[in-house]
Amino acid sequence: MHVICNLLRAELSAHATTLRSFAAVAAIISAMNLAMSSGSATPAIAVCILTVAFLPTSLFAQDERAHLDTMYSILPVTRAQFVIARYLCVVLVAVAATLVGVVVALINDAVRGPGAGVLPLSVAGVAGLAVAVLGVIVAIQLLLFFSLGYTRTGMYAYGATMALMFAFGFLIKKFPDLTATIIRWAGSAWTGVLGPGIAVAVLAVSAAGSVRLYQRRNL
């Protein structure tokens, strides 16, 4: 565990510039969504959380540019430890984005009032639902990156993320019953508990697969 913690610190240090740039972009997107929202700020939580879906692409692109994968290969760490550290890095950013989104939404609602939104949304419900969706997207991305590398999957992973988001919006418009179900989930505080649980389970399965596939790769 000590090695993984040190590796995680090295990850955060090596990708500090990328993480700062990502945080700035996420803040701008969330602020724009918040400014355009006339009702409650609760939906802005989902926007803040889902921006993390684009982080894995940036991390692995930086690995390729700076040859960090080569550096990690000569360090006294196993590939499994590197995989776990990368997953923990993304999880930490996701947790930070969730906390920031929730705090900003609560402060906004306290200052401006909850708004006149007609949807019965819960802060915990929206956050939990967004975390579950993010967990699935990130789990797929990381599995692809570790098994095939950024060069072979970079644009495909980015495109798949965009396609999933557009497909989700299309399904909501096409199937009203699905929309009602999602709104019901977003309005339940229990979703705030189940969502992170689903994300953790999916990421655990993805990490196990990534470890096996990454160990077989010829770097």
Language-model region placement:
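Short extracytoplasmic
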Residues: 68-72
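Hydrophobic alpha-helical transmembrane segments of membrane proteins
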Residues: 1-67, 85-219
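Alpha-helix N-cap/helix-start motif at helix boundaries, enriched for small hydrophobics
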Residues: 81-83
